[in-house]
């Protein structure tokens, strides 16, 4: 079990308050007119405890009246002595603690010149002290002689934090650089948690500080009192760039465990970072590893109610698949823990997942064959009913029977996470059946009337048959075929060290994602210039197959138009047919009575052609205006989110700032406030990092993906539009860049 952590350093919280001024109230003499008296001050009683004192720096001090300055110095001395006494520690530093507090406050503020000046003040004030010729004074003088710039910047407060700890806490890069140049100890561990400056850099989720510290000699292998190394800290804060860098520098994520045997997957699952957990599993971290309580990452995802984490863990197959039957030391499975926490959404998901896994005995090929047959029957059965059953009975039968059959099949045989061949088989079989009707019934009668549309029908039919099948096999533009994991890591390190835009990584493919690319969980790959996943071909549409996709769409439209022409010629060849212009209803009833199959397929084809034609035009527009379908969807979601409240009401989103003693500037909260309890009875880790909250679970999150570590947070969706001609040229002749370009050169301006 992960123990409950104690509240963090009070000093780090208290430094955020404004200075307090203590003054003597005006005295009024009895039986005399009230007169305004000047402010008079008197010191607090020597035995009185100072509840709080804001540390004031020299630059702030000079703005105060002289009498305030004198009183503050007295209070600061008392405050420092009071802190030492309360801590119970033996203070042995050569510099008085009141000066240490001021020095660390200046480091927080990041004023390098003031920091330098105060170091000189410390040196001079300690050199000017006259000591007695006794043993104590001689020892003090020896300590004072050892005061150097390096020793001063490594002075610690009573929590063991140095100037560089606080400079990193405030993300002051100039101050951090100055302290490193002056010889700051980068491996010093504070007293409360054993955190090094590198640990705080990972906690603050800033890879630039991690790079700066490690390149200057910080030890990446040091662990704190709970066994967390830098990688485990960065993982809890969803800081993928720091994690990648530390792994490249030699930290093995498979071997990283804290003293409670929690792996990186345990912690990321507990915090709700689904993509980060996926990333570690892809790197080889065992998702079924058990901690000291016997719990896996799956247990913790169910305990905390993170549905995204639970569904992610359930999506792995093969050697990385999770064992849902593992029981913890209390004999409980993850499902039982979810029940005890009343996470009903997760319970429903796991019930559905269990049923899906048992479907067709787990045979996915049989699953696809079943839905392929269902697709063919979806075309044939309604047509047969309308042809051979009176309309008055056929239409109600189709409406009622179709409704119940659809819902039955969807509830019992449909798996949303899998590709499904129902829609592709409907489209392909309908064209195939109509073409057979054309060859057997229509063509022999109308070929001599007008040969041109018949030639078009045959050409477009075979074009559609061949390239439709090819589309289901065609590579949409898999990025991993063009760039390796090793090259991705090299490019990442170069970008991080040079200060360029850091490329995003796919947590599944483990490669850098170029701009406008996306990972598709159904197709299991990252694709360049991702447009959308098409359920009619069970394949993603990307830069490599979009042109072919558009031609297949237009071939279908042309096929339907040509088919309608020859079908109309076929109807007119019947000498018994009524004249259409005289009675549309009578003509329709005549053709429905005598040629029901052909008429129904013609109506179906026209309806499909209208929809597919609209899709084809929209695909052309994505090229002309250089905005993919996925980007259009994201733009709509962004617009919808801006139309909402724009703030949280506390239920769905976690707070983005910390409250009380658990936060302060450090943003590192220890204790049960973010969990539902602590101790063995609660079932929670009892440890959270409150500065940057975990992502909202799927039950409460918005549609827009909020995981900034793995997804672009794009707001300008027109940035790629450079004119129609340039857009077409880019699509046709400059498509290779979509496999490699990770920096968005259009982010700031349109070219």
From Swiss-Prot:
Pfam families: Ank (PF00023), Ank_2 (PF12796), DHHC (PF01529). Its EC number is 2.3.1.225. Residues 504-554 form the DHHC domain. It catalyses: L-cysteinyl-[protein] + hexadecanoyl-CoA = S-hexadecanoyl-L-cysteinyl-[protein] + CoA. The keyword tRNA processing does not apply. Keywords: Acyltransferase, ANK repeat, Glycoprotein, Lipoprotein, Membrane, Palmitate, Repeat, Transferase, Transmembrane, Transmembrane helix. This is Putative ZDHHC-type palmitoyltransferase 5. It comes from Dictyostelium discoideum (Social amoeba). Belongs to the DHHC palmitoyltransferase family. Residues 1-40, 641-711 are annotated as: Disordered.
